[in-house]
Design a protein with these regions (language model features):
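S-adenosylmethionine/decaboxylated-SAM
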Residues: 2, 6-120
Length: 120
């Protein structure tokens, strides 16, 4: 298992194993930020020998997370770019897509949130 290591994300090995166990055919992720979780999921797909894409969406509004280009570079460094479809898309726009475009086997939802934001 070759995945990123980050103190804030000590559960990445669990995410990797869950992805491998489920062997998903369609993956949706919201809020990749830099890309630690995206790389972890894509690494599991790569190790499965799959041809599945992680459909990862973000809006990159926060200076803390950087730009889309930073995420793409991170994916390249980990050798998993071919397993990731990274797009600028807000969750509220995604939910308006046709149902067939919103199907998934795994949904990883990691947008910038807290209890106050979720209740608003």
């Amino acid at each position: 298992m070759n995945i990123p290591s980050h103190g804030k994300y000590g559960w990445l090995p669990i995410l990797y194993e869950i992805t491998k166990d489920l062997n998903p055919k369609k993956i949706v992720e919201f809020g990749p930020g830099v890309g630690f979780t995206t790389v972890t999921i894509a690494s599991a797909i790569k190790d499965l020998g799959g041809d599945v894409l992680v459909n990862s969406y973000d809006i990159w509004m926060d200076k803390y997370w950087g730009r889309k280009e930073n995420s793409l570079k991170f994916f390249e460094e980990w050798g998993v770019s071919q397993y990731i479809n990274l797009e600028h898309l807000d969750f509220y726009d995604w939910i308006k897509l046709p149902t067939e475009d919103r199907n998934f086997d795994i949904l990883y939802f990691d947008i910038d949130n807290n209890s106050k934001k979720l209740l608003e």
